[in-house]
Amino acid sequence: MASIQSSIAQAAAAPGQRFLAATGPTILQVLPALQTGGVERGACDMAAAIMDAGWRAIVASAGGPMTRELERAGALHLAMPLASKNPLVVWRNAARLEAAIRRWNVDIVHARSRAPAWSARWAARRLRVPLVTTFHGTYNAGGALKHGYNAVMTGADRVIAISDFIAEHVRAEYGCPDERIRVIPRGVDIRSFDPDAVSHERVIALARSWRIADGAPVVMLPGRLTRWKGQGVLIDAVARLGRKDIQVVLVGADQGRTAYRAELEQRVLRHGLEGIVRIVDHCADMPAAYMLSDVVVSASTDPEAFGRVVAEAGAMGRPVIVSGHGGAREIVVDGVTGWLTPPADAEALAARLGEAIALPPGTRQEMSRQAIAHVRARFTREAMCAATLDVYAELLAARDAPGPA
């Protein structure tokens, strides 16, 4: 254990003054790495909220570009090889986490992914520290072995589901009891995703970069290039729509899926949509991208666990057309803030696209107002963080409650 303690000391950056001055409980979040993504975003948002509450936030991961964000918030990062699924490494990570829990007097461990959850569970159980997990996806079972591997996410004192859809999946697939499940939707940063915070200059610069024709209605589908995100369905829908005056932008990198990208490009050519549909690998200013768009589409053919794009578009007051399944459908009030369409139905999507593009200005303005109000009432980062802090407080109260006399 001494060598593990030494490695933990070397893996941690020197804690900052804000961390050392905090007097509240210590929360250790555990995830594979700090690359860009929903899991990482949630961990960083929670670390900042924990510090703002006067508590102490620690994040253990293999590191990545978002580590700097943690440090700016005053949180402590512990570098561990938590992205590995190698059973031996997972076992050693349990010892590393146990040492970290002891050293920093951790009150709650919060695991956000499966392999790290195994390590976190072993460490937390050995030291009788409450464990929280967040179920970020459906984690397709694919057999008894995979099902058992996934089930670690339901073996916590509290299981956070990021949508009602995920909560029902956890109940049905893993038999997790209701009393341990808490539904906490992911939250949007409404300071960044605020129509009033995006200047005309930012929108104009993006339009020039994307070579959008003046006055052309813009349809955008954000999402990495993978088949289930439904880019092909949208291309087919645009072909059925038959309008040549619109611009369709697929925003997302192929992440090595070059064959799928080539397939999409061929589909565009086959439909004669070159000059209308384009693929943009990356967008560094998504708030401006939403403002540039007249319609935002989420055409996923498999259910989304939550639907971040739908919530962000709503926060920006953009009409959304969404596949009517999974967590994404929970974000849309059909016919009020956007529309639901049958998954993988290009004909139905084409009809909704035509309706959305042709919205009268007054109707569009009212839909925008309703969408913004709906997201701000239910899907903000602040609400997500406050609800998660409540889960922590609930577990701490149970831990500290006097036992029977």
PLM regions with names:
Residues 37-45, 217, 221-240, 262, ...:
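A conserved mid-protein helix/loop that constitutes part of the nucleotide-sugar donor-binding site
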Residues 61-65, 188, 222, 247-263:
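Glycosyltransferase donor-sugar binding loop
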Residues 111-117, 135:
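Short His-centered aromatic/hydrophobic patch
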Residues 125, 131-162, 168, 175:
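A conserved, positively charged/aromatic
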Residues 256-261, 273-283, 289, 339-340:
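Active-site donor-binding acidic/aromatic loop of nucleotide-activated sugar
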Residues 319-322, 332:
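Short hydrophobic beta-strand element within catalytic cores of glycosyltransferases
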Residues 333-335, 339-347, 354-361:
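Conserved acidic donor-binding segment of nucleotide-sugar-dependent glycosyltransferases
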Residues 355, 362-378, 387-390:
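A short, well-ordered alpha-helix in the C-terminal region of glycosyltransferases
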